[in-house]
Amino acid sequence: MESESESGAAADTPPLETLSFHGDEEIIEVVELDPGPPDPDDLAQEMEDVDFEEEEEEEGNEEGWVLEPQEGVVGSMEGPDDSEVTFALHSASVFCVSLDPKTNTLAVTGGEDDKAFVWRLSDGELLFECAGHKDSVTCAGFSHDSTLVATGDMSGLLKVWQVDTKEEVWSFEAGDLEWMEWHPRAPVLLAGTADGNTWMWKVPNGDCKTFQGPNCPATCGRVLPDGKRAVVGYEDGTIRIWDLKQGSPIHVLKGTEGHQGPLTCVATNQDGSLILTGSVDCQAKLVSATTGKVVGVFRPETVASQPSLGEGEESESNSVESLGFCSVMPLAAVGYLDGTLAIYDLATQTLRHQCQHQSGIVQLLWEAGTAVVYTCSLDGIVRLWDARTGRLLTDYRGHTAEILDFALSKDASLVVTTSGDHKAKVFCVQRPDR
């Protein structure tokens, strides 16, 4: 793979605060970036000070499932397969995957078979099953220090295990689950449910706090990097930025400021000053996390001529499925259901590149420290793109059905995918100089 040097690229780009976003409109407020990340100990202490309510909970089913035989781990499939390891213990579509953030040596996967497994990336060896779910496991992830792993199913049953002892340490039944995420600095778990609530628990003691949204599902959410706020998107198109300690919304975006359809995804930049939201209305909105104001709106050129959607209407042929910020250049990537990958310049708010896939994009991830963006799609292929040129660098194949989720190791040496073919795969990424 060849790529152009990016030296000087970031330096030649004018800073965001000197530019206008909406044509002749002026920027109302300049957001000053924090001098550095907050101290983890301070954040953990602040989370200790949060007033949680005591919630009654029912005891979960403690009966374990019978593990499938270890020979379910295989090394290859018939046909082209670029993967190094295939994990095949799931008996139905595998919906989600997450890597342990501390060592990037373990994966947790959850699937339609009501099961979740923690396994080793190097050889696919099963460490333990996260047993007891009665519905499809759609969310799974490790805590910030990799000591805990959480799984959540569609019915709203959440469970947490201690990784080293493989023992279940906490469980809770909330409403139908929409999303789940660990706090970036503390053993605190957040989740959004179909009743519009966002839940926050201390784990494992179970102290609970709820953030009541509108009377509709909380469809996506993300904790901001400072660990003190969270942004949540809702089915009615509204966006709320919550103060996690106070339990109150700092900003609410609705009507023309919000989306004209359910939100599908949300992302933040590295310092948490900017938020990107995506929706079935085919728009991606750039929001200042400080002021709560929309400072940019992105639509792909392929649908730019479509009439505006009315309230509650959805695009029949397209929607935003995934989005994210580049960490080294003022670029954002947006992936659409029609297979379009759009690279937008945040400084000029213009479309820089448009890369077409043969089928819908499921998810995208930026490689840390570079301008390379990864996409997975319904055709079962992982692709790497140079966002500076819009050029396809390489692709990785091996699945026989759509890819439903993927994760990238911190050093970008491994891509781990899950698929409708009942498999999870580990691909080794060749990394020339970016």
From Swiss-Prot:
Entry keyword set: Angiogenesis, Cell membrane, Cytoplasm, Developmental protein, Differentiation, Membrane, Phosphoprotein, Repeat, WD repeat
Chain positions covered by the region annotation Disordered: 1-63
Coiled-coil regions, chain positions: none
GO CC annotations on file: cell surface; cytosol; intercellular bridge; microtubule cytoskeleton; plasma membrane
Record flagged with keyword Phosphoprotein: yes
InterPro entries in the cross-refs: WD40/YVTN_repeat-like_dom_sf, WD40_repeat_CS, WD40_repeat_dom_sf, WD40_rpt, WD_repeat_multifunction
Acidic residues bias locations: 39-62
GO terms (BP aspect): angiogenesis; cell differentiation; positive regulation of endothelial cell migration; smooth muscle cell migration
MF term (GO), any: heparin binding
Pfam families, sorted: WD40
WD repeats: 89-129, 132-171, 173-212, 214-254, 258-299, 315-354, 356-395, 398-433
Signal peptide extent: none
Superkingdom assignment: Eukaryota
Protein's cellular compartments: Cell membrane; Cytoplasm
UniProt cross-references to Gene3D superfamilies, sorted A to Z: YVTN repeat-like/Quinoprotein amine dehydrogenase
Modified residues (Phosphoserine): S20
PANTHER family in the cross-refs: ANGIO-ASSOCIATED MIGRATORY CELL PROTEIN (PTHR19857:SF8), MITOCHONDRIAL DIVISION PROTEIN 1-RELATED (PTHR19857)
Function as written in the Swiss-Prot or TrEMBL entry: Plays a role in angiogenesis and cell migration. In smooth muscle cell migration, may act through the RhoA pathway.
Descriptive protein name: Angio-associated migratory cell protein
Gene name of the record: AAMP
